[in-house]
Design a protein with these regions (language model features):
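General beta-strand structural signal in soluble alpha/beta enzymes
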Residues: 6, 28-31, 49, 70-71, ...
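Anionic-ligand-binding alpha/beta catalytic cores of soluble enzymes and soluble regulatory domains
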Residues: 95-144
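Short phosphate-binding loop-to-helix
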Residues: 69-90
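N-terminal beta-strand-loop-alpha-helix module at the start
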Residues: 1-62
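Long, charged alpha-helical interface segments
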Residues: 138-214
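Short glycine/serine/threonine-rich phosphate/pyrophosphate-binding segments
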Residues: 13-16, 78-82, 105-110
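Active-site/ligand-binding-proximal alpha/beta "capping" segment
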Residues: 83-100, 175
Length: 214
């Protein structure tokens, strides 16, 4: 089961939003992310959060139009985006595409990789989809990177140590390497064909792909 999860970052293009949300079985919005969904003509199935960014009037309006609201207190230990991930997992979602996740408040920008890691840890295969490319996190496993030759691919460790890092199908391959925070070895690699594979035996990696393809 696949979900499209709207965050409250910067808006993506309407064609991208409609294409990604159109292939989802469930559309979830984290609080103010519902605004971006509505602006693209999409009513979320579920809105999660404290509704401070969305506002009470619009929250009631989106509920009137068929969305379910999962309300949380303003004082909480998780971001609305993290709560949206958990809500999706509870509903049987196994894959999620995040929209409107890049940009926005600086603190929220740096939180996105950690939301992806939270999704990874509950078994959600997740990808941030943007007009400039994609971003995902893997922990202790491998994943294909699909795109076009010469797409830029950068990898960054999200844990104190990422061990057994292997890159196949890229211009600068790695085999069983170890990466540490503060290490820029993984910056700006590139695909040599239409797909490559990133693997890590232990630890977590953030993978950022820059491509012109949606």
């Amino acid at each position: 089961m696949r979900a499209a999860i709207f965050l409250n970052g910067s808006p993506d293009s309407e064609p991208l939003i409609q294409a990604v949300a159109g292939r989802a079985d469930l559309v979830v919005a984290a609080d103010g992310g519902a605004r971006y969904a509505l602006a693209a003509g999409i009513v979320p199935d579920l809105v999660v959060g404290d509704m401070d960014s969305l506002g009470e009037d619009l929250a009631l309006e989106v509920e009137r139009r068929g969305a379910s609201l999962e309300r949380h207190p303003a004082r909480k230990d998780m971001m609305d985006g993290h709560l949206a991930v958990l809500a999706a997992g509870e509903r049987g979602v196994t894959a999620a595409d995040f929209l409107c996740a890049a940009g926005g408040k600086p603190g929220a920008v740096f939180a996105v990789p950690h939301i992806l890691l939270a999704a990874e840890r509950i078994g959600l295969r997740s990808t941030v989809v943007t007009d400039w490319g994609r971003m995902f996190v893997i922990e202790g496993r491998s994943r294909l990177v699909e795109g076009s030759a010469r797409d830029s691919v950068s990898i960054f460790p999200l844990s104190t140590q990422a061990t057994g890092v292997t890159l196949e199908g890229m211009g600068y391959p790695l085999e069983n390497a170890d990466l540490y925070p503060g290490d820029t070895l993984g910056f700006h690699n590139e695909l040599i064909g239409t797909e490559a594979r990133v693997s890590v035996e232990r630890g977590a990696l953030l993978v950022v792909q820059e491509t012109s393809a949606p």
